[in-house]
Amino acid sequence: MSNILNKIVATKKIEVANRLKQVSLANQRAQAEANNQDVLLKPRGFIQAIEKKITAGKAAVITEIKKASPSRGILRELFVPTDIAQSYEKHGAACLSVLTDADYFQGCNDYLQQARAACSIPVLRKDFTIDPYQVYEARAIGADAILLIVAYLELNQMKDLEACANELGLDVLVEVHNASELEQALELKTPLLGINNRNLKTFEVTLQNTLSLLSMVPNDKTLVTESGILSHTDVQLMRDHHVNAFLVGEAFMRAADPGAALSELFS
């Protein structure tokens, strides 16, 4: 595990312990279950939205709402999640990914709630999930999917977190960075597999990371390429290799109009 991931996970353990003191697990679970009965808050079908785009022959783009990152600092000074969400939806995003980590990405749960309320597309809670408490919390704040990152989770942990998510109607995006992580990810039930093109140790980005792992991905998985998609050439390279789902954040966050940037990149 990289130094930054070590720090994030250590911080996250403290965060979860503190959250438990503020809102009990039972209360989070009750809110999550209540949301599942609410017509406005029940899960919107994250995987379904991606597969619908792909079936229609379109690129399925998960567009990110992210204020800052550890490697790049502040990405967007004028940060209004509702406006960004509406712009993304208007320009054809399949889903949203909203950063809720406060310490390293300057995110918060409110950003996810604001973004989801402003649009009708499904929302991924982009955070560092280590504990079932966070899964219940994700559904309690309205998330439609969660992220599991193989780099810092044991297989049994991931299976438990996935089972918890599925019980609540949450979809799961499992993220890998290399072949050994991919082998573990394939042990999970989720059909949604993300390959991150960013090396979490060096923060270098290369699309070759996705291409080099393609042969290991079974046909029954929906592959999402993450990070480093910056040009029409990048998009076409992936689509030529039958990769039709993308997670893009930084390129859009730096644009004056994130939704217009989405349209331009995938036109």
UniProtKB/Swiss-Prot annotation:
UniProt xrefs under Pfam families: IGPS
Reactions that this protein is recorded to catalyse: 1-(2-carboxyphenylamino)-1-deoxy-D-ribulose 5-phosphate + H(+) = (1S,2R)-1-C-(indol-3-yl)glycerol 3-phosphate + CO2 + H2O
EC number of the protein: 4.1.1.48
EC category name: lyase
GO biological process, one term: L-tryptophan biosynthetic process
Molecular function terms from GO: indole-3-glycerol-phosphate synthase activity; phosphoribosylanthranilate isomerase activity
Keyword vocabulary terms for this entry: Amino-acid biosynthesis, Aromatic amino acid biosynthesis, Decarboxylase, Lyase, Tryptophan biosynthesis
InterPro entries, per database record: Aldolase_TIM, Indole-3-glycerol_P_synth, Indole-3-glycerol_P_synth_dom, Indole-3-GlycerolPSynthase_CS, RibuloseP-bd_barrel
Cross-referenced PANTHER family: INDOLE-3-GLYCEROL-PHOSPHATE SYNTHASE, TRYPTOPHAN BIOSYNTHESIS PROTEIN
Annotated family: Belongs to the TrpC family.
Protein's UniProt name: Indole-3-glycerol phosphate synthase
UniProt organism field: Polynucleobacter necessarius subsp. necessarius (strain STIR1)
